[in-house]
Design a protein with these regions (language model features):
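Small-residue-enriched alpha-helical segments and adjacent helix-cap loops
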Residues: 1-100, 111, 130
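A short, ordered amphipathic alpha-helix with a cationic face
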Residues: 101-105
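TerminUS-proximal long segments
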Residues: 106-134
């Protein structure tokens, strides 16, 4: 039960951070005043795709973020598979463009995997470990 509560609190903190970014930090929605239902339905400008979810399925992105954000200084560790410890930790990106949309990455073909690995500068075998290839 405590793990479920911790997960919900982490997600709520991420959502609140996104709201503060929209209104006060980046200020692209300074007058936003949404109800709880509107927030739940994501009726705000921008999106917050999270690493490991359908629109950003490559869990290895966490290794890049770990270097950029200095995870150890935040008390966050990564497993060899890119999962975060403590479990109730979330990473993602914030996108402010008014027309951005969530989307799911479908089945990834071998040609796409090879091209993606080449663009990332890593081997296809390494990337395959972090993607659901089904």
């Amino acid at each position: 039960m405590s793990q479920i509560l911790a997960d919900r609190l982490a997600e709520a903190a991420a959502e609140r951070g996104h709201e503060l970014t929209r209104k006060y930090l980046w200020r692209y929605s300074p007058d936003e005043n949404l109800t709880s239902n509107e927030l739940f339905a994501e009726h705000y400008q921008g999106k917050r795709p999270a690493v490991g979810y359908p629109s950003l399925p490559d869990q290895s992105i966490n290794f890049i973020l770990a270097d950029l954000l200095d995870f150890p200084s935040l008390g966050v560790e990564l497993t060899e598979n890119g999962a975060m410890i403590p479990h109730s930790t979330t990473t993602g990106l914030m996108v402010s463009h008014p027309q951005c949309q969530h989307f799911s990455v479908g089945t990834i073909g071998e040609d796409q995997l090879t091209d993606y690995a080449l663009r990332r500068g890593v081997s296809a075998e390494w990337v395959r470990k972090f993607l659901d290839m089904s």
